[in-house]
Amino acid sequence: MKRTRAGFTLLEMLVAIAIFASLALMAQQVTNGVTRVNSAVADHDQKLNLMQQTMSFLTHDLTQMMPRPVRGDQGQREPALLAGAGVLASESEGMRFVRGGVVNPLMRLPRSNLLTVGYRIHDGYLERLAWPLTDAAGSVKPTMQKLIPADSLRLQFYDGTRWQESWSSVQAIPVAVRMTLHSPQWGEIERIWLLRGPQ
């Protein structure tokens, strides 16, 4: 009488284990790849959101620039737009100005709709500074917000006929501002904002 086989041989078991092990290894590699891609996408998404937030701040602030000179801490008159190398202790160029359009619903808060804002390069980042006061703002500590990593900032101002490297008018604001920002993440970024000037 012939005996029939009632199971797998050792060789068949080893081949099956090898196949399942290779399938498990491939599945793990696919999972690791998807995790790495998701992490890279999330990191890039975070950087892109920060860039969009930075451009949004700049756009809202610059397009609301007011031709309003300010009074310094000692009562001295300062220009409506203060810009140049070292302004606000910037490691590159910086700028400070008064903007309007700050929301004060039903005038319930004891403040105006004006805000003094500034931008500078500090510790490798573009920073936005905001003072609640328009006059003698130096006597109040500003709120600072780190924006995108940046190592240089260059500003130019359009007076209606030509671009200038500096702005010297005490009361008037330029027609447009050109900003060239160098960021290690994004390279060179150039943007032009049309303002309310000349006024």
From Swiss-Prot:
GO terms for cellular component: plasma membrane; type II protein secretion system complex. The chain crosses the membrane at residues 8-27. The modification N-methylphenylalanine is found at F8. It is a single-pass membrane protein. It is found in: Cell inner membrane. Keywords: Cell inner membrane, Cell membrane, Membrane, Methylation, Transmembrane, Transmembrane helix. It holds the Pfam family N_methyl. The keyword Cytoplasm does not apply. Residues 1-7 form a propeptide. Its main location: membrane. Disulfide bonds: none annotated. Cleaved by prepilin peptidase. Methylated by prepilin peptidase at the amino group of the N-terminal phenylalanine once the leader sequence is cleaved by prepilin peptidase. GO terms for biological process: protein secretion by the type II secretion system. Component of the type II secretion system required for the energy-dependent secretion of extracellular factors such as proteases and toxins from the periplasm. Part of the pseudopilus tip complex that is critical for the recognition and binding of secretion substrates. Belongs to the GSP J family. Type II secretion is composed of four main components: the outer membrane complex, the inner membrane complex, the cytoplasmic secretion ATPase and the periplasm-spanning pseudopilus. Interacts with core component GspG. Interacts with pseudopilins GspI and GspK. This is Type II secretion system protein J. The gene is gspJ.
